[in-house]
C-alpha cells in the first residue's frame, strides 16, 4: 500500500458496496460534481487496475498496478511528471523497475489490449497490492480498461481538503461511499489478511513472552528457596520477601526488554 500512502489525497469516494476495492468500483463524471462544488475541496478522478505489461521487444513482462490520473490534478506533484503525462501517451513507472533493467523508451503492450506505450520516465511511486505502480493519463487508462466505450468511467474520486461533515453530505448526495485514505488500505489485495496475520503473530509473541517470564520467575523462586527460608528465620515478613522477589524479577525484565528493543532497533537500522 506504499503507493496509495504516498499519494497526496486525504479521502477516496468509491461505488457503494465496493469495499474500497478499485476493481469493483466504477464511477462517472457526475460523481465529481457534488465534491467540486465545495469550497476548499480538490476532487479528481482516479482510475486503478492491475495489468500485465508485455514487452514489445520480447523482454520480461511487468505486473503493474496501473493508476490513471489527470495530468493537471493535485495527484501529480512533479512538474516533469505533469509534462510527461500531458504529452503523447506513455508510462511513468515506479523507480524500482529501473533497477530491474527497464529503460526509458522501452515499449509495452498493456492489459491484453492493443495499446502500446513507451516508458517516459521513473518516479518514487511505491507499490499497491505488492505490484509496482505505473502512472498513465486518465484517458489512456480508460482506453486500456474499457476500449472505445469508456464513457467517462473511472474507479474512484480522490479528494483533498474540506470539512468532513460537508464531504459526508456531498457523498450522500452523489451516492458514493466516502473513506479516509487509511480506511481505503483495506481494499488492497491481501492487506486485511496480512494485517490479521501480523496481529496474530504479535499476540502469540506476547503470550509466549509472558509464559517465558512466568517460567523464569518460577525457576528463580525455586532456586531461592533456602535463601527465603533464611530470611523468614531472621524475621523477614511475607510482604518483604514478595517485594524483594518481584523487584528482582522486574529489574531482570526491564533490562532484558531494553536489550531486546536496542537489538531490534539495530536490526531495523
Predicted feature locations:
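Membrane interfacial helix motifs at helix-loop boundaries and amphipathic/re-entrant anchors
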Residues: 2-7, 18-21, 182-201, 262-269
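Alpha-helical membrane-embedding segments
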Residues: 38-45, 179, 257, 261-268
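Transmembrane alpha-helical interface segments in multi-pass membrane proteins
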Residues: 230-269
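Peri-transmembrane interface segments
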Residues: 172-213, 218-226, 230-231, 242, ...
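Residues within alpha-helical transmembrane segments of multi-pass membrane proteins, especially transporters
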Residues: 1, 204, 211, 216-217, ...
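Basic-flanked hydrophobic alpha-helices used for secretion and membrane insertion
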Residues: 50-55, 62-189
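Hydrophobic, regular-secondary-structure patches
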Residues: 1-63
Amino acid at each position: 500500500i506504499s503507493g496509495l500512502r504516498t499519494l497526496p489525497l486525504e479521502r477516496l469516494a468509491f461505488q457503494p458496496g465496493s469495499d474500497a476495492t478499485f476493481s469493483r468500483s466504477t464511477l462517472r463524471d457526475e460523481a465529481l460534481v457534488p465534491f467540486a462544488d465545495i469550497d476548499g475541496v480538490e476532487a479528481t478522478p482516479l482510475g486503478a487496475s492491475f495489468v500485465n505489461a508485455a514487452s514489445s521487444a520480447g523482454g520480461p513482462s511487468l505486473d503493474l498496478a496501473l493508476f490513471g490520473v489527470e495530468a493537471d490534478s493535485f495527484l501529480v506533484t512533479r512538474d516533469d511528471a505533469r509534462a510527461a503525462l500531458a504529452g503523447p501517451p506513455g508510462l511513468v513507472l515506479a523507480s524500482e523497475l529501473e533497477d530491474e533493467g527497464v529503460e526509458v523508451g522501452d515499449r509495452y503492450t498493456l492489459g491484453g489490449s492493443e495499446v502500446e506505450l513507451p516508458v517516459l520516465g521513473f518516479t518514487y511511486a511505491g507499490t499497491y497490492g505488492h505490484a509496482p505502480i505505473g502512472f498513465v493519463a486518465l484517458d489512456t487508462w480508460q482506453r486500456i480498461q474499457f476500449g472505445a466505450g469508456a464513457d467517462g468511467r473511472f474507479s474512484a474520486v480522490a479528494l483533498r481538503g474540506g470539512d468532513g461533515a460537508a464531504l459526508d453530505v456531498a457523498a450522500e448526495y452523489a451516492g458514493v461511499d466516502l473513506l479516509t485514505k487509511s480506511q481505503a488500505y483495506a481494499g488492497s489485495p491481501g492487506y486485511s489478511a496480512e494485517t490479521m496475520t501480523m496481529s496474530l503473530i504479535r499476540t502469540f509473541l506476547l503470550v509466549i513472552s509472558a509464559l517465558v517470564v512466568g517460567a523464569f520467575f518460577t525457576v528463580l523462586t525455586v532456586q531461592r528457596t533456602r535463601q527465603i527460608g533464611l530470611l523468614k528465620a531472621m524475621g523477614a515478613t511475607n510482604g518483604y520477601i514478595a517485594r524483594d522477589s518481584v523487584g528482582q524479577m522486574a529489574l531482570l525484565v526491564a533490562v532484558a526488554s531494553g536489550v531486546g528493543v536496542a537489538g531490534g532497533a539495530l536490526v531495523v537500522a
